């Protein structure tokens, strides 16, 4: 089983790329994170596994997460895949989570999906409603994540054109499957 970690700043298009890959590749599935937060009205049915804090902590203490963190008082974690999993697994997580995954599974394919430039990232963030101040904060965070990802050996994919980026990510996955 191949484990693919996809990270990148908000607005880079990683979610869109991940969905396109999973929809077009029957050998690839998107990981479902566990969370202790409450279900929102707009949550997609299979996006998360909603659990109590006690359930989360029990799995955590048993070593049952590839990576996990806390955000705004709620826990989020990516479960260790089942041994019987016959499909490759795609994780859409931040670089800090990717660091945890690599500590356990150093052969994971780690991809950093990025906008072609900070100006383009700013444009995308503002267009989706983040506002100028929030966009600047996200760009500063993206620079930090970019540097961390590079230090961890992530492969960078610039999403200047969505279809081209999807083809590039698919080629990296195919090469990893072939053992290249």
Predicted features and spans:
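Walker A/P-loop
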Residues: 15
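ATP-dependent small-molecule kinase phosphotransfer cores
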Residues: 33-89, 96
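P-loop (Walker A) phosphate-binding loop of NTP-binding proteins
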Residues: 9
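Small-molecule kinase domains that catalyze NTP-dependent phosphoryl transfer to phosphate-bearing small molecules
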Residues: 130-176
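Post-Walker A helix-loop "phosphate-sensing" segment adjacent to the P-loop in P-loop NTPases
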Residues: 23-31
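The feature captures the helix immediately C-terminal to the Walker
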Residues: 18-19
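Conserved phosphate-donor/acceptor-positioning beta-strand/loop module used by diverse small-molecule
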Residues: 90-94, 104-127
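Hydrophobic anchor at the beta1->P-loop junction of P-loop NTPases
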Residues: 6
